[in-house]
């Protein structure tokens, strides 16, 4: 009998395979509670992954043997249950096209509102608000995101600052080059202008001297030479005798 029992246990273990256990109620209370906690957490994680990866509306409701409630819903448990009831009633009485479109757009609107709410919560978390609902792991992830964001902002700021400095240095070199060019032009003009001014002064002086000398010569001639008509006798008194000179 013992050999037969041992062979039966071996056959049953072979049927279950490696790493598998027989699915039946766990009699030990402590083991049952530990298994419940592990399986519950795994089920909640799978429900979350399904809702995120497949964009599915998921609602999960769990009651423990003690009557404690555990739930998860990416939208809301009540809303998902109402949708379930409506889907069951629609299976009996199919809705019209208008009702189907209305239901579709309501679902899309609800999804958009949920996304907006998530974005608003994320924005509040970034500025340090509404942090009471976050656990340690979520706070750690938020801290890492903020540090990465600050690092990117600083890197971009430094990049713009370096570009601005390079532009100003280039502009300074251009202005210095233009300044040197203008100084060279001014120096060249200063070298050429004295020759031109000297030649113009010489020409003006020559013209002035020539004009003055001709005028002075004419005045000199007028002063040194008596006009001929003054030496000629007056034709009015030419026929009369001139009175003798009388000494008084």
UniProtKB/Swiss-Prot annotation:
User: What cystine linkages occur within this chain?
Assistant: none
- One matching Pfam family is SRF-TF
Q: Name one GO cellular component term.
A: nucleus
GO-annotated molecular function:
DNA-binding transcription factor activity; protein dimerization activity; RNA polymerase II transcription regulatory region sequence-specific DNA binding
Q: Does the keyword DNA-binding apply?
A: yes
Q: Which UniProt keywords apply?
A: Developmental protein, DNA-binding, Flowering, Growth regulation, Nucleus, Transcription, Transcription regulation
Annotated MADS-box domain residues: 18-72
Please state every residue range assigned to the domain named K-box.
102-192
Transcription regulation in keyword set: yes
Question: PROSITE patterns per the record?
Answer: K_BOX, MADS_BOX_1, MADS_BOX_2
Q: Which CDD domains match?
A: MADS_MEF2_like
- InterPro entries this protein is in? MADS-box/MEF2_TF (IPR050142), MEF2-like_N (IPR033896), TF_Kbox (IPR002487), TF_MADSbox (IPR002100), TF_MADSbox_sf (IPR036879)
Q: Where in the cell is it found?
A: Nucleus
Alphabetically, which GO biological process terms does the record hold? flower development; positive regulation of transcription by RNA polymerase II
Q: Which residues form a coiled coil?
A: none
Its biological function?
Probable transcription factor. Interacts genetically with TT16/AGL32 in a partially antagonistic manner during flower development. Is essential for the coordination of cell divisions in ovule, seed coat development and endosperm formation.
Listed under subunit, the entry gives: Interacts with AGL15 and AGL16.
Q: What is this protein called?
A: Agamous-like MADS-box protein AGL1
């Amino acid at each position: 009998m013992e050999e037969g029992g041992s062979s039966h246990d071996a056959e049953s273990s072979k049927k279950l395979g490696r790493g598998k256990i027989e699915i039946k109620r766990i009699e030990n209370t402590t083991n049952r509670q530990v298994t419940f906690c592990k399986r519950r957490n795994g089920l909640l994680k799978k429900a979350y992954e399904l809702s995120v990866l497949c964009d599915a509306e998921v609602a999960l409701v769990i009651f423990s043997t003690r009557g404690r409630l555990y739930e998860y819903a990416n939208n809301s448990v009540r809303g998902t249950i109402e949708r379930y009831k409506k889907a069951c009633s629609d299976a009996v009485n199919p809705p019209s096209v208008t009702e189907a479109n209305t239901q579709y757009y309501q679902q899309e609107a609800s999804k958009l509102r949920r996304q907006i709410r998530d974005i608003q919560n994320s924005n509040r978390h970034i500025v340090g608000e509404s942090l009471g609902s976050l656990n340690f792991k979520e706070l750690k992830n938020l801290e890492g995101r903020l540090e990465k964001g600050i690092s990117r902002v600083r890197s971009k700021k430094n990049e713009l600052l370096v570009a601005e400095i390079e532009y100003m240095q280039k502009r300074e070199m251009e202005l210095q080059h233009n300044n040197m060019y203008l100084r060279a032009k001014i120096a060249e003009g200063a070298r050429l202008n004295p020759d031109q001014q000297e030649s113009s002064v010489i020409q003006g002086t020559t013209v002035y001297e020539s004009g003055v000398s001709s005028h002075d010569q004419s005045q000199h001639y007028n002063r040194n030479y008596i006009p001929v008509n003054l030496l000629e006798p007056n034709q009015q008194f030419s026929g009369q005798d001139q009175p003798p000179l009388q000494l008084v």
